[in-house]
């Protein structure tokens, strides 16, 4: 076997043994030592928890208010009926949610074949048992909501979010969206030329019939590859820190002197000296203001007190005053 000692072997799909339409064995080899468990466990977890599918999520049965009741003429109690509906295998094309109906009367079993649906829905196992009617006059009618989802979502996880709008008699069902019912993998020894320390991965799985086992493994591998893409092109994706530009001047300095609500005498004196903004005022000294005509010590004291209440004072130095926004006016 030629190649670098650091070069990894690439596995190939050796065999697909179709035991039945819902049961298959898939064999991959050769794998580097340890990679049988690495890939087998990853694929197993994805197949059990992350495969999309359709499942019954809500049921309404005529004359039934809650799941802890029974229905006259029906052999099973409501909990058992819900459990049977939970195992219903449905394939839906092009929709995320459909409503199915079932109406049956007379003695005999009620199966998935009795469900009324449109052309977008396929009942994979029509013989799936739902309940038994035990009386000629007995009947059962129900509305079944089927939704598309992923993994497993218990009814308890949806109770709080739907409680306010869910009417009495609408029964929630644990939603098992995953089409994979059972999966196991086994790692066996494999050999390539002189190497005898390699792995062979054998995956055995059963589905509910809504997906072909080979297609299920293909989807699981695609999900795994997509999740690992970020690591292939690993780089620092941290966003550069955006520094907020601090204003050059305190906004209060850009406000007009009128906002200080000075007396009319003091305000007129400042305007006569072309002091229009608070920034203009704080740069003046007491001596400069006292030289202003008609502005005495009383007005000066008023100005100082008003500025102090805003954390300002006379005689302040402001670099680059006035700002462009004021200078252009």
UniProtKB/Swiss-Prot annotation:
Region (Alpha N-terminal domain (alpha-NTD)): 1-235
UniProt region (Alpha C-terminal domain (alpha-CTD)), positions on chain: 249-329
GO molecular function: DNA binding; DNA-directed RNA polymerase activity; protein dimerization activity
Presence of keyword Disulfide bond: no
Catalytic activity: RNA(n) + a ribonucleoside 5'-triphosphate = RNA(n+1) + diphosphate
Gene Ontology terms: cellular component: cytoplasm; DNA-directed RNA polymerase complex
Keywords assigned: DNA-directed RNA polymerase, Nucleotidyltransferase, Transcription, Transferase
EC main group: transferase
Pfam families: RNA_pol_A_bac, RNA_pol_A_CTD, RNA_pol_L
Transmembrane residue ranges: none
One BP term from GO: DNA-templated transcription
EC number: 2.7.7.6
Subunit structure of this chain's protein: Homodimer. The RNAP catalytic core consists of 2 alpha, 1 beta, 1 beta' and 1 omega subunit. When a sigma factor is associated with the core the holoenzyme is formed, which can initiate transcription.
Functional summary from the UniProt entry: DNA-dependent RNA polymerase catalyzes the transcription of DNA into RNA using the four ribonucleoside triphosphates as substrates.
Family classification: Belongs to the RNA polymerase alpha chain family.
NCBIfam families: PRK05182.1-2, PRK05182.2-5, rpoA
UniProt note: domains: The N-terminal domain is essential for RNAP assembly and basal transcription, whereas the C-terminal domain is involved in interaction with transcriptional regulators and with upstream promoter elements.
UniProt name for this protein: DNA-directed RNA polymerase subunit alpha
Lineage of origin: Bacteria, Pseudomonadati, Pseudomonadota, Gammaproteobacteria, Enterobacterales
Gene name tied to this protein: rpoA
């Amino acid at each position: 076997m030629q190649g670098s000692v650091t070069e990894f072997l690439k596995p190939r799909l050796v065999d697909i043994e179709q035991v039945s339409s819902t049961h298959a064995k898939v064999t991959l080899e050769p794998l580097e030592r340890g990679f049988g468990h690495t890939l087998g466990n990853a694929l197993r977890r994805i197949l059990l928890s992350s495969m999309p599918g359709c499942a019954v999520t809500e049921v309404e049965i005529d004359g039934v208010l809650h799941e802890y009741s029974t229905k006259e003429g029906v052999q099973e109690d409501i909990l058992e009926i819900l459990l049977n509906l939970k195992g219903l295998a449905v394939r839906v094309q092009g929709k995320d949610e459909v409503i199915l109906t079932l109406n049956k009367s007379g003695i005999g079993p009620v199966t998935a074949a009795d469900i009324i649906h449109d052309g977008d829905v396929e009942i994979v196992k029509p013989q799936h048992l739902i309940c038994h009617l035990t009386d000629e006059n007995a009947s059962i009618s129900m509305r079944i909501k089927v939704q598309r989802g992923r993994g497993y979502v218990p009814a308890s996880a949806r109770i709080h979010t739907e409680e306010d709008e869910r009417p009495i008699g609408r029964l929630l069902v644990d939603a098992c969206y995953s089409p994979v019912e059972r999966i196991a993998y086994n790692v066996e020894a494999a050999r390539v030329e002189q190497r005898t320390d390699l792995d062979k991965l054998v995956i055995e799985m059963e589905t509910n019939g809504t997906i072909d086992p080979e297609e299920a493994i293909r989807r699981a591998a695609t999900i795994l590859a997509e999740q690992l893409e970020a690591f292939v092109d690993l780089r620092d994706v941290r966003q550069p820190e955006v520094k907020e530009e601090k204003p050059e001047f305190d906004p209060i300095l850009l406000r007009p002197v009128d906002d200080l609500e000075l007396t009319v005498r003091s305000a007129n004196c400042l305007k006569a000296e072309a002091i229009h903004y608070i920034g203009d005022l704080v740069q003046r000294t007491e001596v400069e203001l006292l030289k202003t005509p008609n502005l005495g010590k009383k007005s000066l004291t008023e100005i100082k007190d008003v500025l102090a209440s805003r954390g300002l004072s006379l005689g302040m130095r402001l670099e680059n005053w006035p700002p462009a926004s004021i200078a252009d006016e």
